[in-house]
Amino acid sequence: MHDKSLKELCEQLSISIATGRNWVKLGKITPQYIKNGVPYFDKKHIAIIENEIRSGKNVALKSRRNKKYVSGNALYRSYVSQNCKNLTVLQKLLSEITREQILLTSDVISYFVADCALQLFGQKPLFFQYLQGKISIGKYDILLDALIGDRQRAMDFCQKYPAFFAHEYIWEPGEDILGLIYLSCKNMGSRKARGSYYTPTKVVKKLISHLDIEHIGKVLDPCCGTGNFLLQLPESVDLADIYGTDTDAVSIRIARLNMALKYPDADVEEICEHITEKNFLTEYDRTGFDTIIGNPPWGYAFSNEDKAVLKARYATASGRNTESYDVFIERALEILVPDGTLAFVLPEAVLNVKAHMRIRTILLQRSSVKSLTFLGD
């Protein structure tokens, strides 16, 4: 295991980068070294930090421990349909996590998601046996292994908490149960800092219902998360025409598993080529999309370095405050084909708040609005 940067440590602990920087500044955590201005932490020190948060031994980090147990284990019921059969099972899992006071690092959350994924591929609750190499899901092992990471570390956790992996999940087409586990376990504070809130399935379906599926062509979700928008596309849309990208590495690993479940005959290489971990605004270079869908992040806290890069590239980033969804719209319009379709879930403010004048001007200059639908709160 290589040393982790402050950003990677924050992702593992499910805290915002701002919180991590503040902890370093206040001396609550100490990096082993700093390279090119970036703090790095070794495996041993990360384990100490996790143990201190879990036990509450470090008073300075105790508030973080309490916040995580109180707000981090909420079942996000609205993410899936009301009839989702896995809700009861997941609620039991979350209750057990709360009772045992488990620190929900990104690794631990990944184990829960991987256990569920294994069952959706047709296996019973045999996660530990999978980790031992006794069972397989064939060509998709590589996708599951990417989510699990260090097998020995996962086995150690399974042996310590076997009850967590005794729950039985069932495959429900169109239900992103993998995303629901990830979302429900992930700390609310982390989602706020990243500007990302996962979209309820009923909202996703409503947006997709307005699309001309027969002419949807090549479709992209530039902020795909665990892939729910792509999962809700009709079966008639071929994987060859589906693309997604996101900056959250765990989300992308889950989205790839979701695509493997939706398209059981798909090649792993095609899934990985189409569902990528990239920054849509600065790294994603595919163009020529017929349809772009999704729910771009609202209120993302860009760093000063990010702002400088975006300001040099996008008109919507030239103001004092850069709103993430404005820049997403501008970039999406750039990579659409002529007469392509852009369908985003956006806040009402984009229509009438002065700060969004630039993107409204761009929309009027480069596109025509076909429909606006109020989705409610």
Identify what each model region corresponds to:
Residues 1-23:
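Polyanion-binding surface elements
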Residues 3, 13-14, 28, 32-44, ...:
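Signature of N6-adenine DNA methyltransferases within the class I
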Residues 22-25, 52:
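Mixed-charge intrinsically disordered linker/loop segments at interdomain junctions
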Residues 30, 48-52, 275:
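Short, basic amphipathic alpha-helical segments that act as recognition/interaction helices
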Residues 44-78:
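A short, Lys/Arg-enriched interface patch at domain edges and termini
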Residues 75-261, 279, 352, 359:
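Class I S-adenosyl-L-methionine
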Residues 256-283:
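S-adenosyl-L-methionine
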